[in-house]
Amino acid sequence: MKKEEFLLIAKELNIKLNIVPLLFGSLGLEQRLDMYLDAEDIDVLIPEKFLNEKWQYIVNVMVDNGYALYDLHEHAFIKNDISFAYASIESLIPFAGIDISKIPIINENDIRYFLLELQDYLKVYTASSK
């Protein structure tokens, strides 16, 4: 269900805002491994300008899809116990040393999104543990 919710929002981001989001966190790892990991939420990375000066565009997409903003600081929304949070894709560079220009794009039913490779997930989880 979470993957379907991500794809629904990713499609909206692709079409309305020309954003290719990065499926991040446990749900992204679940997708990369093709293994169920019981991801608790949906974490998505997008260009930083959409977390700042263009934030209202994201809010509009989420509200139009039945989500309510519940944590502005974390850029987090909720719908039917599904938490959907945004962060900056550019933060991967200083945080984990990931070259965002080399992240592969997945095209699933004409919905485009970035998905980290396993070695990049290792960099993220290593950086998170420090």
What are these regions (language model features)?
Residues 1-130:
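Compositionally biased terminal segments of proteins
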